[in-house]
Amino acid sequence: LKKNRLPTNLVFYDDFEKPKKIKNNSVDCILGMGAFYYSKNFKKTIKNQTKKLKRNGRLIFSLRNKLFDVVTLNDYAERFLNEIYEIKKLKKNWKIKYKNLFNGFTKRKKIKLKNIDDKGVYSLFHNPLTITNELLDLGLKCEGFYFYHFHPLPPVFENFDQLYYRKISWKMENPSDWRGFLLASSFVVDCQKI
């Protein structure tokens, strides 16, 4: 910053869940890439960030895509479908039959996957079909969302040929492709304070 004759206080450290160094109604735009889905209290964090924005200010941030779970063909898919089908409400023998359907593709531990979710790091997933209303309740109007980190096949295929997998993934990257609702593991939300 000094080298380019910019004020050195433009960049500073603060708590993104409870920001204290920025005054309320003082910021035009807040960019939170790869941060907000680690918040222990997402709604409170978004409210705290929104307070810092000027009227009509923008909050742009990334979220993990809950709908991606359904196409992973692993324990993420099972978790997603358990929620949709309300498995907890089924009688015991049906729960067992249902669980047996997933025996073939939920054993992630057999393949050594390097994934932050296996390291006990807390993170949230959000549904791109419902995020607009969720943010509206928090004082933000969703202007758009944009998908990224597309997966051309279930994630386990990356272990078979990582370079090829990434090559075909890059070819798919298109933030407005409808397939992103299912094939992208993350999305960016662009909101305006209302």
Predicted regions: what is each one?
Residues 43-58:
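A short glycine-rich, Lys/Arg-flanked "PGG" loop and its adjoining helix->strand segment in the class I
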Residues 31:
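A conserved beta-strand element that flanks and buttresses the S-adenosyl-L-methionine
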Residues 110-137, 142-194:
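A C-terminal cap/extension of S-adenosyl-L-methionine-dependent methyltransferases
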Residues 58-101:
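Conserved class I S-adenosyl-L-methionine
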Residues 5-18:
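Conserved SAM-binding strand-loop segment of SAM-dependent methyltransferases
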Residues 18-24:
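Short conserved loop adjoining the S-adenosyl-L-methionine
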Residues 34-35:
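Short catalytic micro-motifs in class I SAM-dependent methyltransferases
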Residues 1-2:
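Conserved SAM-binding loop
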